[in-house]
């Protein structure tokens, strides 16, 4: 079942934790690619110096953040790596959750080809498929074309995992500082990164 619009409403930190264990799905050329979300970071808008929308900054790139929750915010870093975020909070409150890492589930062969241009890969390469925001976007075929897309769409959405299949019973959720935000002054220390401790696909222990 797709996560309904109400799933993305409410406190961004709570939405971030709720996203753990759910399945990120992207249909590419009719083939389902997906992975279980194992690591996220919350960004809380105007008061968060690490957020693109800090101080209420509103640009063509960030405009989608000011819209309705439950939409995709995709941007480029270093001019080459895409990052996928889920918009949260009410309209006009530019907050979101960065999906940092997933465990591949569906479309494994397509994911391997997207990452390594081959399907015969080593164990180390397999572990490296989707353990970072840029890696998972490349693996799932998420690009700037997906910016602003509703997560109620058939081709890009969050699929809720049934409780009996949820991996939360196997891993402890740990909170810590977000990664690569040295510019963000006191916000560097906010414990707004959430991940499954010990999960092999987490980007950084």
Curated annotation (Swiss-Prot):
SUPFAM superfamilies noted in UniProt: FMT C-terminal domain-like
Entry-linked InterPro entries: Formyl_transferase-like_C_sf, MPG, MPG_sf
Signal sequence region: none
GO biological process: base-excision repair
One of the record's GO molecular function terms: DNA binding
Keyword DNA repair in record: yes
Enzyme Commission code(s) on record: 3.2.2.-
Record's keyword terms, sorted: DNA damage, DNA repair, Hydrolase
Name of a matching Pfam family: Pur_DNA_glyco
Enzyme class: hydrolase
Family: Belongs to the DNA glycosylase MPG family.
NCBIfam families per record: 3mg, PRK00802.1-1, PRK00802.1-3
Protein name in the entry: Putative 3-methyladenine DNA glycosylase
